[in-house]
Amino acid sequence: RRVLREMVGHLIVDASEEKLGDAIAELTKSGNRLNVNLLGDNEAEHRLSETKRLLARDDVDYVSIKVSAVSGPHQHWAFDEVVEEAVRRLTPLYELAASSSPKKFINLDMEEYKDLDMTIEVFTKILDQPHLKDLEAGIVLQAYLPDTLAAMQRLQAWAAERVANGGSSIKVRLVKGANLSMEIVEGVMHGWPVTTWDTKQAADTNYKRILDYALRPEHAKNIRLGVAGHNLFDVAFALLLAEDRGVKDRVEFEMLIGMAEQQAEIIRRRVGHLLLYVPVVNPKEFDVAIAYLIRRLEENASSENFMSGIFDLATDEEIFKREEDRFMRSLNSVTDEVPEGKRHQNRQTENADNVFVPAGRFENTPDTDPSLSGNREWGRAILERSKTTQIGIATLKENELTSAAEAEQLVADAEASGKVWGRLSGAERAAVLRNVGKEIALHRAELLEVMAAEAGKTLDQGDTEVSEAID
């Protein structure tokens, strides 16, 4: 563990009181600012208090935090409750930033796609509080999601109204995205489309599409932009675009500490200062930094990523041409269209014509995706109906057995039906069972309603069981 800490000490800073101050002083001596992000898997209360302790330091004026850092593992069906709790718990941190002199900055980090709506909702609800209207704060958006430009436009509309009402502008930190593996796993496990762009070039194009939108003067006045990344072509493009449009003062260039430091220094000289993303971790909890380090290794190792060739860029014409061609292909693909997200499941509009049925060979039926607002509304309605549900009661009464003769008749009927079933071919039985599966799918809501009423099943528990029955 000690050897590993020494190997990656330039990427992650020791959060202990006796070492953090010297590290901050060293990183800021050239004029750079720091965005301090506390790594760790401690309970939410500890994460929040430690982040507050960091923000209260005289040498820290900018921190990052995630919704999950204060809510812990949360159930996405309980969207409203999680948002309300996160707002309640995060507000004192924002109040500390607002009451500091000068004001300090809090950046709300984005996690996986399933947290996109929730993070935006928490962010806007915190800053909608009247006593925080003059506080500038930030949020992260990930360009590898097709939904991101629409999310940026949503934030732009909200920020424009905020500024028009005398409030402060906000900041968006634009990144490519670093949770691809988790997005793939999430999609495969539940039978959902993977949320990210299908190719790296499409993600790069989306990054430039969002830069083009964000760096228009009428937008930049409401949202300051953090251009986060190490791709020198993208950095140069953003800088020249901002200068050409007269909004350079509304752009901040951001990089990770310890990554491509020579190139970062050249950019710092050109733009004035960099905002360095500084992960800090308590030495006793160093294991939690492994995930962060793995993501950095992936970025450096994959030939699709710019970082894989950054040290050969100036000396290897082939590497330079490769990156130049990638940049031009992505730039030439930029359009004004607002891409749609990859997931469109909506249980509210499901019917016999569009319910999922495998076209050929067996496929697991997709679970309900609670990251989509239509599905969450559908789930809320189920829970509300479950309080007074009467489903199945009439059927029970109609089929109640009141005598031994009725029981014997039922057994005889079942025996006769079994003989009919036995005469069916395999293909005929399969057709019947496929229809049964379809009918179960069409009655998913009713089944969940009864599960909740009779067994106290939560939506996340019941929904997967309905999917298993369909399969």
What kind of feature is each model-predicted range?
Residues 1-359:
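Positively charged, amphipathic and often flexible ligand-engagement surfaces
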Residues 272, 283, 288-438, 442-453, ...:
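Terminal low-complexity tails and localization/encapsulation signals of metabolic enzymes
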